Regions:
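Feature primarily recognizes SF3-like P-loop helicase cores of small DNA viruses
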Residues: 1-59, 63-218
Length: 218
């Protein structure tokens, strides 16, 4: 337990302030951000979820995305869009990826093929083994997915199961140019070890709740 003499809570004032500001002071949403980071880092795909940072420009989405990207080794991060994930075969660079990060989803309606693919890729079931790379090797099912958009999600065909896979992190607190901290990413990276440690604590609590993210319906 954090706060004991044996395991003090990591000190992460920059992250704490950033998450609080990005969430507009909504503590439930702050908790969800911590849970998201913890789950993305943990070697666990049981939640069957992917993550969406959603809201206007200049709200901190890209800074958070770049910070999360920097947690992982470069060779374990890919940048395939939803439409690219819907292609017949996964590209070779996806092999070994632990995080797929696409930070600028368009306002176009998403094709049903891409919807089905992301459901399979986050499904943690045997059917994902039918997803192939171009050299016919099977997908190993270890990648997590983080997307960001300034727009509402639009589908060519409604799909309840797709929306049930999304853990949305809304960003609505627009920061003006004069108040923007251009060194924020560097400051967050200086706290990286503490942020990851704290996020993994939230992840352990998430597991105890059977992967019910803060603020989600049961």
């Amino acid at each position: 337990t954090y706060g004991s003499a044996y395991e003090p809570a990591p000190v992460t004032p920059v992250a704490d302030n950033f998450f609080y500001s990005a969430a507009g002071g909504n503590q439930s949403l702050v908790t969800r951000i911590w849970e998201m980071i913890g789950y993305l880092v943990a070697p666990d795909i049981m939640a069957k979820k992917f993550f969406l940072l959603q809201g206007p420009s200049n709200t901190g989405k890209s800074v958070l995305g770049r910070f999360i990207q920097n947690i992982f080794p470069k060779g374990q991060v890919t940048g395939l869009s939803l439409s690219q994930l819907g292609d017949a075969n996964l590209p070779a660079e996806f092999m070994g990826s632990r995080l797929n990060l696409s930070m600028d989803l368009s306002n176009n309606k998403t094709d049903p093929k891409a919807i089905e693919r992301i459901k399979l890729l986050t499904g943690n079931d045997l059917i994902s083994q039918n997803i192939k790379y171009k050299d016919n090797r099977s997908y190993n099912g270890q990648c997590k997915f983080l997307f960001s958009t300034n727009h509402p999600i639009r589908l060519k065909q409604w799909d309840d199961a797709f929306f049930q896979r999304i853990v949305c992190i809304p960003f609505y607190n627009v920061i003006s140019q004069e108040h923007k901290d251009t060194k924020l990413l560097d400051k967050l990276l200086s706290e990286k070890d503490g942020i990851v440690s704290k996020a993994l604590f939230y992840y352990q609590e998430l597991k105890k709740r059977n992967y019910l993210f803060e603020g989600q319906d049961k």
